[in-house]
Amino acid sequence: MWRTMGEAYKVQQLNGYPQPALEAVYKCTLGSARALSLDDRIGSFLPGREADFIVVDYAATSVQKLRMEYLRSRDKWTIENKLFGLQTLGDDRNTVCIYIMGKQVYGSDSCDHQEASM
C-alpha cells in the first residue's frame, strides 16, 4: 500500500496536484469503501465494523529514523508528516502487526501499539 501511495504522490506532483498524505490514506481506506458502497461495513474503526488493519513502525529503517529525528528536532512531529514518510519511504519493514477481522494474524504477541522508540 505504501509504495502505491508513493507512486500516486509522484504522479500527482508531476501533474501539479500534490496530494496530502492524509488524503492518500483516506482514499486507501474509507474513500475506497465508499466508492464500493461498503462504507457501512469497512473503512473505519467505528464499533461494529469489520476491522482489517496494520500497526506500523514509522522508523523501521535507518533513513526513516533519521527523518523522524529531524522532524522531532524541529517540532514537526505530526500525523501528516509521519504518514508522508510512510507514503514516500514505507515498505513491508514498517509493518509490526497485522489484524484481520480484529484478530492478530502477524506480529509479536506483545503488539501493544507503542510508538517506535528512537
Report the location of each language-model feature.
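Intein/HINT protein-splicing elements and their conserved insertion hotspots or analogous self-processing inserts
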Residues: 108-118
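His/Asp/Glu-enriched, well-ordered alpha-helical/loop segment
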Residues: 1-71
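C-terminal cap of metal-dependent C-N hydrolases
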Residues: 51-109
